[in-house]
């Protein structure tokens, strides 16, 4: 079975989670399948092999899972973007709107440097709102997002609009099925 098919088979689709009418794309099947998990990281490595990247930034919490092994392989710093109040010390913060309310992302001020070229990673790209806020957050410290990577993309939720101007790469796209 081709590796790409292994990824698709590993992603469970859970109806009515976390609330009625929502189809949840569960990536945990990738994590318990070493071949699928390795394939994800291999794809990131191949996609960004020629890219000038100074650091990898990851969205809490499932973005950490995919960004960390890539950062280790490339010997790059890993910048954690966390929810409000989870980071000690001085932070940059940004408020943003979700489909179900407001949220805040923060990053340590000391982790972001002016001119830093950052690859932004999350497990799933839905509306693009969180990733757009993350890019704005990194810009507060002078960093520039050179690409956005997600294992799963949901283009039917129009993330392309929120992330216009960014080079977005996903491994698997779903059309709402």
Residue ranges and their predicted role:
Residues 65-74:
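Short Gly/Thr/Asp-enriched flexible loops that form oxyanion-binding sites at enzyme active sites
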Residues 53-60:
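Short glycine-rich phosphate-binding loop at a beta-alpha junction
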Residues 1-53:
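Active-site-facing substrate-recognition patch
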Residues 3, 9, 133-177:
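PRPP-dependent phosphoribosyltransferase catalytic core
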């Amino acid at each position: 079975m081709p590796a790409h098919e292994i990824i698709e088979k590993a992603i469970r689709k859970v109806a009515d989670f976390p609330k009625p009418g929502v189809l949840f794309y569960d990536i945990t099947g990738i994590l318990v399948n070493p071949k699928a998990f390795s394939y994800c990281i291999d794809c990131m490595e191949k996609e960004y092999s020629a890219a000038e990247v100074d650091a990898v930034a990851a969205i809490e919490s499932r973005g950490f899972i995919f960004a960390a092994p890539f950062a280790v392989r490339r010997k790059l710093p890993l910048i954690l973007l966390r929810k409000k109040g989870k980071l000690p010390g001085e932070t940059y913060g940004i408020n943003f709107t979700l489909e179900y309310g407001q949220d805040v992302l923060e990053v340590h001020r000391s982790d972001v440097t002016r001119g830093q070229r950052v690859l932004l990673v999350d497990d799933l790209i839905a509306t693009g709102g969180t990733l757009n806020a993350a890019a704005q957050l990194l810009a507060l410290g002078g960093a520039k997002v050179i690409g956005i990577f997600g294992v799963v993309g949901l283009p039917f939720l129009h993330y392309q609009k929120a992330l216009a101007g960014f080079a977005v790469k996903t491994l698997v796209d779903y059309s709402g099925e």
